[in-house]
């Protein structure tokens, strides 16, 4: 199930959106995790699915370059979300990104001319 959601969900929605995105000159953002950079014990499928998303996005960016479609990955550091609380319990909020900060950087990415990039969102990294 994890691979279907994390990887195939990304692949299927990106490929299914091609004609619409091409016609509308839209962009695509996918989300990964810092786990994509290194496999972690007890997270083998999760880590590998996130690495697969990154490689897929980079490949599609190259394949679709001439169409003007831009596609990027957002890689947020540890973020304060209900799923994180469920999996890791209560943590010091000063060590976690807010979801609004991740959304702000996502919007900035959409406004950029980048394609095929992994945009790392780190705590107190951006001062715009």
Predicted segment positions?
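Active-site Tyr-X3-Lys motif and surrounding loop/helix of classical short-chain dehydrogenase/reductase
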Residues: 1-4
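A short, exposed helix-loop element centered on a Lys and neighboring polar residues
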Residues: 14-15, 58
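A short helix-coil junction within the Rossmann-fold of NAD(P)-dependent oxidoreductases
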Residues: 16-25
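Catalytic loop of short-chain dehydrogenase/reductase
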Residues: 27-52, 57-66, 78
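Hydrophobic structural elements of the Rossmann-like NAD(P)H-binding subdomain
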Residues: 29, 71-74, 84
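C-terminal helical subdomain
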Residues: 73, 81, 89-128
